[in-house]
């Protein structure tokens, strides 16, 4: 498995504004809480980007990421009511 990487400033922003962090995402991945992985629906604007749907604290979050040759780069964490409803 490739290592995960992310922007430290973005992680701090997520902690302060959304009360979630990339560390929590990684923990959820290792706990097999990934519900889906799919290509980003807008490949023109976000070429090569994929999205994790991950359950954290009974809520589904969307985590866009880019799979590089040496790492998986996590872009952001988006809470999703629609995905939460879909997986309940």
Located regions from the model:
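Ribonuclease/tRNase effector modules and their secretory precursors
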Residues: 1-88
């Amino acid at each position: 498995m490739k290592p995960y990487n992310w922007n430290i400033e973005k992680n701090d922003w997520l902690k302060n504004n959304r009360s979630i962090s990339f560390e929590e995402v990684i923990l959820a991945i290792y706990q097999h809480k990934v519900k889906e992985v799919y290509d980003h629906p807008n490949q023109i604007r976000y070429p090569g980007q994929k999205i994790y749907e991950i359950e954290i604290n009974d809520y589904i979050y969307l985590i866009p990421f880019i799979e590089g040759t040496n790492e998986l780069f996590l872009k952001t964490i988006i809470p999703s009511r629609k995905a939460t409803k879909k997986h309940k």
